[in-house]
Each structure stands twice: as structure tokens, then as C-alpha cells.
Amino acid sequence: MALHSAIKGKLISVIGDEDTCVGFLLGGVGEINKNRHPNFMVVDKNTPVSELEDCFKRFLKRDDIDIILINQNCAELIRHVIDAHTSPVPAVLEIPSKDHPYDASKDSILRRARGMFNPEDLVR
């Protein structure tokens, strides 16, 4: 299945709580590549930060992933790694979780994107 999808396009990966991952998996996002590595990681309160960081770095290195979706509360735990990622691909998008609403003030990627545009250029 992963080989077929890789031919058609790139993948979206998900790092988050069980509810977030299950939702995206039910939506058809889940894949396992030829090396038997999934494109998602379920994080719970017992997941070590080092494991979360390693997974994020693995997703960054995979050439079949173009977008990484990560729960914002997970992103907070590895903020230094996310901030070090400056390449546009894979794009990293912070999303809310069931228990933690999205807070735009914590999203460093959004702050970077806002800095790229002059607000006066957007008004016509």
C-alpha cells in the first residue's frame, strides 16, 4: 500500500495523542513504508521526550513525507528541534488535541510565517 501511495504522491505524517492519530488514520492517512516504518506516532503521558524527538527527526529525513502534523502540546516538548527545522519541506503544522486547544501564540512556525509578510501588502 505504501509503495502505491509513494508513486502517486507524498505522505502526511501525524504525531499526537491517540484520538488525533486514530482520526487521521480513519481518514486514510496511515501508511507503512517498505522498511515497515509507519508515518504516525501515538504519544501518551508515558512517552519519553527522546522517543518523540527521534520520531520527529525520522519523519524529517524520510523523502516520502511532505507534511508533518503534530499536536501542539507534543510540539512544546520538542520546540528546540522544531525551531531548528527551517526547510519548507516537510512542512510542520501544529494542530490542537482533544485536551489541549490550539494557541497561536505558542506556534513558532506561524510566527515565522507571519514575519515573511508585511500586513500592508495583504490589504487591497
From Swiss-Prot:
It comes from the Eukaryota. The keyword Transmembrane helix does not apply. The keyword Transport applies. SUPFAM superfamilies: AtpF-like. One of its GO terms (cellular component) is proton-transporting V-type ATPase, V1 domain. Coiled coil: none annotated. It holds the Pfam family ATP-synt_F. GO terms for molecular function: proton-transporting ATPase activity, rotational mechanism. InterPro entries: ATPase_V1-cplx_f_g_su (IPR008218), ATPase_V1-cplx_fsu_euk (IPR005772), ATPase_V1_fsu_sf (IPR036906). Keywords: Hydrogen ion transport, Ion transport, Transport. V-ATPase is a heteromultimeric enzyme made up of two complexes: the ATP-hydrolytic V1 complex and the proton translocation V0 complex. The V1 complex consists of three catalytic AB heterodimers that form a heterohexamer, three peripheral stalks each consisting of EG heterodimers, one central rotor including subunits D and F, and the regulatory subunits C and H. The proton translocation complex V0 consists of the proton transport subunit a, a ring of proteolipid subunits c9c'', rotary subunit d, subunits e and f, and the accessory subunits VhaAC45 and ATP6AP2. Belongs to the V-ATPase F subunit family. Subunit of the V1 complex of vacuolar(H+)-ATPase (V-ATPase), a multisubunit enzyme composed of a peripheral complex (V1) that hydrolyzes ATP and a membrane integral complex (V0) that translocates protons. V-ATPase is responsible for acidifying and maintaining the pH of intracellular compartments and in some cell types, is targeted to the plasma membrane, where it is responsible for acidifying the extracellular environment. This is V-type proton ATPase subunit F 1. It comes from Drosophila pseudoobscura pseudoobscura (Fruit fly). The lineage of its organism: Eukaryota, Metazoa, Ecdysozoa, Arthropoda, Hexapoda. The gene is Vha14.
